[in-house]
């Protein structure tokens, strides 16, 4: 007589096989999750070639990239399209990389050559000598004399005006019609009065010849201003300073009082 199959035994075996299969699937899923979701810190030198299992705190982190050098994008022809420098601790995400790749080409800035006019001052062209061999007296009745040694000027009360310095005045062109730039040269020499900083004595500068054009050496130029019988010589290089005198002092540059900045011009030639 044929044996009747035990249906309960078959159901039991089927249930057991499904349980084992389900267990294997769950284990595989867990392994895949830890593989894809976990992020790892860089291995230390002493941990190289050693297995390190990720901790639970390392799961579900956003992938990040740290760069220590410049990121440079170069076209096929070798031209630099984009250069960006990142700090040591700056993180670069995938979105940042995509943004850099999609940025338009930037022009590499090059230093532009500066026009000569940027460096040079206004150009002053020589015209002519407008006064010759005149004497400068201040309102203290002092005349300008040449100090011993010949490098400086001073003011002194003179009995004999032959001891006073005689000057020639050379006129130059200016952009402003209301101003007349001039040079003061000691007559029959190549020594020109040169302005210095405030309260510093003026110098006598020797030039090979009368400058035909003055650009940079504006210390040699003064704006000649006349107010009645008073004459003022304002420095072109230092527009707030005038040629000035004081008792027992060298001729110097000053803004005004206590220094004397106005002069009388005494003509010695008719």
Curated annotation (Swiss-Prot):
Domain of life of the source: Eukaryota
Main location: nucleus
Protein name: Interleukin-1 alpha
Positions where N6-acetyllysine occurs in the chain: 82
Biological processes annotated in GO: cellular response to heat; cellular response to lipopolysaccharide; cytokine-mediated signaling pathway; fever generation; immune response; inflammatory response; positive regulation of canonical NF-kappaB signal transduction; positive regulation of cell division
Domain notes: The similarity among the IL-1 precursors suggests that the amino ends of these proteins serve some as yet undefined function.
GO MF terms held by the record: copper ion binding; cytokine activity; interleukin-1 receptor binding
Keywords: Acetylation, Cytokine, Cytoplasm, Glycoprotein, Inflammatory response, Mitogen, Nucleus, Phosphoprotein, Pyrogen, Secreted
Similarity field: Belongs to the IL-1 family.
PANTHER family per record: INTERLEUKIN-1 ALPHA, INTERLEUKIN-1 FAMILY MEMBER
Region named Nuclear localization signal (NLS): 82-86
CDD domains: beta-trefoil_IL1A
PTM description: Acetylated within its nuclear localization sequence, which impacts subcellular localization.
Residues annotated with Phosphoserine modification: 87
Function, in words: Cytokine constitutively present intracellularly in nearly all resting non-hematopoietic cells that plays an important role in inflammation and bridges the innate and adaptive immune systems. After binding to its receptor IL1R1 together with its accessory protein IL1RAP, forms the high affinity interleukin-1 receptor complex. Signaling involves the recruitment of adapter molecules such as MYD88, IRAK1 or IRAK4. In turn, mediates the activation of NF-kappa-B and the three MAPK pathways p38, p42/p44 and JNK pathways.
GO cellular component, one term: nucleus
Subcellular location as annotated: Nucleus; Cytoplasm; Secreted
């Amino acid at each position: 007589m044929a044996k009747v199959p035990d249906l309960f035994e078959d159901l039991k075996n089927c249930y057991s096989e499904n349980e084992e299969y389900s267990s294997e699937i769950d284990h595989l899923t867990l392994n895949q999750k830890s593989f894809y979701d976990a992020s790892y810190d860089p291995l230390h030198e002493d941990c190289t070639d050693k297995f390190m299992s990720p901790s639970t705190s390392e799961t579900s982190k956003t992938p990040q990239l740290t760069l220590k050098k410049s990121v440079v994008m170069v076209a096929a022809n070798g031209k630099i399209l984009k250069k960006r420098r990142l700090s040591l601790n700056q993180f670069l995400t995938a979105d940042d990389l995509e943004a850099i790749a999609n940025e338009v080409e930037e022009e590499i800035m090059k230093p532009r050559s500066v026009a000569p006019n940027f460096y040079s001052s206004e150009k002053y062209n020589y015209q002519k000598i407008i006064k010759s061999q005149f004497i400068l007296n201040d309102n203290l009745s002092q005349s300008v004399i040449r100090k011993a040694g010949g490098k400086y000027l001073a003011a002194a009360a003179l009995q004999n005006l032959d001891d006073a310095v005689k000057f020639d005045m050379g006129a130059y062109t200016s952009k402003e019609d209301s101003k007349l730039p001039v040079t003061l040269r000691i007559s029959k020499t190549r020594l020109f009065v040169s302005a210095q900083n405030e309260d510093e004595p003026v110098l006598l500068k020797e030039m090979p010849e009368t400058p035909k054009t003055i650009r940079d050496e504006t210390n040699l130029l003064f704006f000649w201003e006349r107010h009645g019988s008073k004459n003022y010589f304002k420095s072109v290089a230092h527009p707030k300073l005038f040629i000035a005198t004081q008792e027992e002092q060298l001729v110097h540059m000053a803004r005004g009082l206590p220094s004397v900045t106005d002069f009388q011009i005494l003509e010695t030639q008719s």
